[in-house]
């Protein structure tokens, strides 16, 4: 899997696409944990890529939620 998880690429995706991608990455992360625990891990660098991609997606989701909250509170004032 030669996926790129650059912030600019992730910002272009919809919220539903990000949630689906996050779910897939979480599943992959679990599979990597099990394979590492059993000693069958082949691609150890992928663990780092997946972990960082999950963090990027969560960060973007949090930022968009904060922006939406700031807009509604500014509109109320």
Swiss-Prot record:
Family matches, as CDD domains: Ribosomal_L29_HIP
Chain segments annotated as coiled-coil in the UniProt record: none
InterPro entries associated with the record: Ribosomal_protein_uL29, Ribosomal_uL29, Ribosomal_uL29_CS, Ribosomal_uL29_sf
Keyword Chloroplast: no
Lineage top rank: taxon: Bacteria
NCBIfam families named in the record: L29
Protein name: Large ribosomal subunit protein uL29
Name of the encoding gene: rpmC
């Amino acid at each position: 899997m030669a996926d790129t998880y650059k912030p600019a690429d992730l910002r272009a995706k919809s919220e539903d696409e990000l949630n689906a991608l996050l779910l897939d990455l979480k599943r992959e992360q679990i599979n990597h944990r099990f394979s590492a625990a059993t000693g069958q891990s082949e691609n150890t660098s992928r663990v780092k890529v997946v972990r960082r991609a999950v963090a990027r997606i969560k960060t973007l989701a949090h930022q968009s939620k904060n922006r939406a909250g700031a807009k509604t509170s500014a509109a109320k004032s």
